[in-house]
Each structure stands twice: as C-alpha cells, then as structure tokens.
Swiss-Prot record:
Isomerase in keyword set: no
Subcellular locations according to the entry: Plastid, Chloroplast outer membrane
Tissue and organ expression note: Ubiquitously expressed at low levels. Mostly present in cotyledons, and accumulates in seedlings and embryos.
Transit peptide: 1-73
Biased composition annotated in UniProt, kind: Polar residues: 1-11, 23-43
Protein name per the record: Outer envelope pore protein 37, chloroplastic
Organism of provenance: Arabidopsis thaliana
Entry's Gene Ontology molecular function annotations: identical protein binding; monoatomic ion channel activity; porin activity
Gene encoding the protein: OEP37
Assembly, per entry: Forms an hourglass-shaped multimeric complex.
Family affiliation: Belongs to the plastid outer envelope porin OEP37 (TC 1.B.47) family.
C-alpha cells in the first residue's frame, strides 16, 4: 500500500512560514520565531497509514457440487504467523465446515467449529541435530509424540515416535536411499492375541537412466521402475505376492504436446490423456477412462499447477465436458472458477 505522503507532498511537510517584516525582526531582537502550527491530521490519512495486515480472500466455485469454498487469511507479527478462516457455502448461502487455523514456525492450531474440536501440532528444535514433534486431538484425547535425531553422516537420521496415551512405539531409520520402520502390533491367531514385529520401508536407487523403487508395507512388496528422458517416460510396476502388474507410458511430441497412457494387466483397465499447452496460462486436456467408461475434455485458463496469485487477474477457470460411453445424451458440462483478492 502506497504511503499517502508520497502521493501528496503537502501531507508530508508543513507549509513554510511567511517571511516576517523587518519591523518585526527589529522588535523581536534575538528571540526565536515560534514554530509553525501543524496541520490537522485527517481521519482518512490515518486509516491509510495504519499498519494493518493485508487480507487475502480466495473463493472457488464448483458447478458440479454448487458449493463455494472460501478462505480468508492474513499474516501476523511481521510474517511470523498466519491466521486463516475457511468455510463452504451453497446457493442458499448456508455456511458449512467452518474452520479457523493459526500457523507459525513452531505451533499450529486448527479449530473445527462444527465438531468443536481442536488439533494442535508443535515442533521444537532443541539442538541443531535434535527435533521434537507433537500432535494432539483434543476431542479424541489422542495424539503422537516423536523425536528425530540427525546422525553424524549426512542424510541419515533416526526417528522414535509413539501414540498417546497408549500404543506401541515406532522406530524409523532414514538414509539417502530410503527409510525403514519397525513397530510391534497385535494379531489375533486361533483366538489368541499374538504380538508381532511389523516392517515397512521404501528403497530408491538410480538404475541406468531411471529410478528403481521398492515399497514394502503390510506384507506386500511393490516394485516400480521409472525411466524418463526428454521425450519418453516408461513406468512398469508389479505387486507381490498378488502379481498385479501395470505400466504407464508417456510420450512428449513437442514442448507443448504430451500423451499419457496407463494399463493394468490384472483388470484390463486402461486410461489415456492427451495434453496440449498454449503458452503458460492455457491448457487443453482430453482423455478416456475404461474403469468408469467415461470420456472427457477440459480447458484450463490459468496455470493448472501454479498458485492463483501468479495467474493473470489472479483467477483460474476450468471447463470440463464429461461424456459417458453408455449414455452420450447424459453428457454434462461443468466449470470451476477460483479467484483471489488482496485487500
């Protein structure tokens, strides 16, 4: 916000005093001239120069659900904290899901007005290599505490966490190639409760021109290889022991044209998407999904992946046409608009 004094010099400096007559100078002798009277400060200039936080108002409308998603936020204490109010309202102006949140570097508080519940998250760096974290659900009286220590080797850390008030602790070792977690859990076996050790982890490694990933969770292993260059991406994956396999294929024909295809060998389901961009702020997408037997096309005005504040007029618009394969007459045209105001 511009300072009013820079727009009108008369508000910044008082008018110069009128030159005294020679007679007055002789009579006053060595006495000082009285300072000029200060012009009265108007209420309007005071309001303009008041240091209030700037409000950011964002509203998004979805024609499919006929709902407005509204957010009002401002930064406090020289951008050290953020206060945000979010809520939804329908065409009858009925407000639902109101939430108020306060976020700072070390403490975050989210209050759900309808549920009358508060979620608290805190982070504290007690040492350059030691961090404490805590999560708490006030209504459920449940949470989690965690401690993460960075080891001497770069990229290595050890995290210990435990549910509150009861639960088995979990230990996670993080390293440059992935992470491994260990946690005890109870299993029922022949009407008896048995305690077992659960192992989850993920490993990533560069192989040739791609990345090989192994994800193990809940006694299921998923292997995935992602090859990517400037024009081609090929991503096969398989899950064990179910042997469910799939692959994704992406081909870039030019900087503005791209085709993506996905196929699942287990279910014979597939989907395809063609994308074309026109500059930075226009994107056309068309595709088909065999799982729901639906063809669709969408037009984005404004950067789809970017923030609304970087788009022209701080607004993004999406138009989408959905055409069911089994009933073309029931095709529907939808749109979504997102706009931001800085007050």
């Amino acid at each position: 916000m511009a300072d009013p004094s820079s727009q009108n010099p008369n508000l910044a400096t008082p008018p110069p005093p009128s030159s005294p007559s020679p007679t007055h100078q002789i009579q006053s002798g060595t006495s000082e001239l009285s300072p000029p009277s200060r012009p009265p400060c108007s209420t309007l200039s005071f309001l303009k120069t008041a240091n209030r936080p700037k409000l950011r108002v964002t509203s998004e409308f979805d024609s499919d659900s006929l709902l407005f998603l509204n957010k009002v936020s401002c930064k406090l204490f020289d951008n050290l904290a953020k206060l945000k109010l979010s809520f939804q309202n329908n065409s009858q102006r009925e407000i639902s899901q109101p939430q108020v949140s306060f976020t700072s570097k070390h403490v975050s508080v989210l209050y759900d007005v309808e549920e009358k519940n508060t979620f608290i998250k805190s982070t504290l760096d007690v040492h350059p290599r030691l961090q404490l974290r805590a999560l708490h659900n006030v209504k459920a009286q449940q949470g989690e505490v965690a401690m993460e220590a960075n080891l001497t080797e770069p990229g290595y850390s050890l995290e210990l966490s435990s549910p509150v008030p009861i639960g088995y602790p979990r230990a996670t070792l993080k390293f440059p190639l992935g992470e491994i977690s260990l946690q005890e859990k109870d299993e029922e076996e022949e009407e008896k409760q048995k305690r077992t050790l659960s192992v989850n982890g993920i490993l990533k490694r560069q192989v040739m021109n791609g990345v090989c990933t192994a994800l193990y969770t809940d006694e299921e292993l998923r292997l995935r290889y992602a090859y990517k260059d400037d024009a081609l991406s090929f991503i096969p994956s398989i899950s064990l022991p179910s042997n469910a396999a799939s692959f994704a294929f992406k081909r870039r024909f030019s900087p503005s044209d791209k085709l993506s295809y996905w196929y699942n060998f287990d279910s014979n389901m597939w989907s395809a998407v063609y994308k074309r961009t026109y500059g930075k702020d226009y994107k056309l997408k068309a595709g088909y999904d065999s799982d729901v037997r639906l063809g669709w096309a969408s037009l984005w005005v404004g950067d789809e992946a970017g923030k609304v504040k970087t788009t022209p007029m701080k607004m993004k618009v999406q138009f989408m046409l959905q055409v069911p394969q089994d009933d073309i007459k029931s095709s529907v045209l939808m749109f979504r608009v997102k706009k931001r105001w800085d007050i």
